[in-house]
């Protein structure tokens, strides 16, 4: 009785009724998303762009102003986008690409053309696309000096102050006012100074600077005129 059961099992195996092999399956695994911490260095904002010059404020590194305004720099007050962005120092980890896992049977039967040596694979990835990176469409590569020149900040140039120009009538009125107050603005005369500036059309700070710059020259000129009158 037991012999007949074994014979039936053997007949089932040899009859060709076995289930077909399962097709190879691919399993894609990707690493958890890793945050890239970027670091922002010196401020590259051109404060003299309106006048055609190039002046930076000299801020060396971005510092958040507060939790309410995290994108404003506490040192220079500029937006974070004006600072040079460098993701490499604060990078938490290299981004991992999805890995392709194949069954061992498929990897063992892979054609030789798909299994490239490490050196050949690296050289193949390093070749640029034709027509990209060179004017002639060749296979030239860009040098590291060009990228360094873009990232290198320009030297800080001294900011030129715009000089205020006065008309001849304004100079005569300011000279008469300066001689009347003794070439010195007192605190008791603030109302008089404000009224004079509004009447002549000059700013108070401009009047103060003009009196400071021309005080000695006009006094020397007046002294010379007095000496000439006494000699005559």
Swiss-Prot record:
PROSITE patterns: ZF_HD_DIMER (PS51523). GO terms for biological process: regulation of DNA-templated transcription. Coiled coil: none annotated. A zinc finger (ZF-HD dimerization-type) spans 40-86. The record marks 211 as: Required for DNA-binding. Residues 159-222 bind DNA. It holds the Pfam family ZF-HD_dimer. Residues 1-11 have a biased composition (Acidic residues). Residues 1-25, 126-170 are annotated as: Disordered. Keywords: DNA-binding, Homeobox, Metal-binding, Nucleus, Transcription, Transcription regulation, Zinc, Zinc-finger. GO terms for cellular component: nucleus. InterPro entries: Homeodomain-like_sf, Homeodomain_ZF_HD, ZF_HD_homeobox_Cys/His_dimer. It is found in: Nucleus. GO terms for molecular function: DNA-binding transcription factor activity; transcription cis-regulatory region binding; zinc ion binding. The homeodomain differs form the typical one by having namely 4 instead of 3 extra amino acids inserted in the loop between helix 1 and helix 2. Putative transcription factor. Homo- and heterodimer with other ZFHD proteins. This is Zinc-finger homeodomain protein 5.
């Amino acid at each position: 009785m037991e012999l007949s059961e074994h014979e039936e099992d053997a007949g089932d195996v040899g009859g060709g009724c076995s289930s077909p092999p399962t097709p190879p399956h691919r399993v894609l695994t990707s690493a958890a998303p890793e945050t890239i911490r970027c670091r922002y260095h010196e401020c590259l904002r051109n404060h003299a762009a309106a006048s055609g010059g190039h002046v930076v404020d000299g801020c060396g590194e971005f510092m958040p102003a507060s939790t309410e305004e995290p994108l404003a720099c506490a040192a220079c007050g500029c937006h974070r986008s004006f600072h040079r962005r460098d993701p490499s120092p604060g990078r938490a980890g290299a981004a991992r690409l999805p890995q392709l896992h194949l069954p061992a049977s498929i990897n063992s039967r892979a054609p030789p053309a798909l299994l490239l040596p490490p050196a050949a694979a690296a050289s193949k990835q390093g070749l640029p696309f034709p027509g990209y990176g060179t004017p002639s469409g060749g296979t030239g590569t860009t040098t590291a000096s060009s990228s360094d020149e873009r990232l290198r900040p320009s030297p800080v140039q001294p900011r030129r102050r715009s000089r205020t120009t006065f008309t001849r009538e304004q100079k005569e009125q300011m000279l008469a006012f300066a001689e009347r107050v003794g070439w010195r603005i007192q605190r008791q005369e603030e109302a008089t100074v404000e009224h004079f500036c509004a009447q002549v059309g000059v700013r108070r700070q401009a009047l103060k600077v003009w009196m400071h710059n021309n005080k000695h020259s006009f006094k020397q000129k007046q002294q010379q005129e007095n000496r000439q009158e006494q000699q005559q």
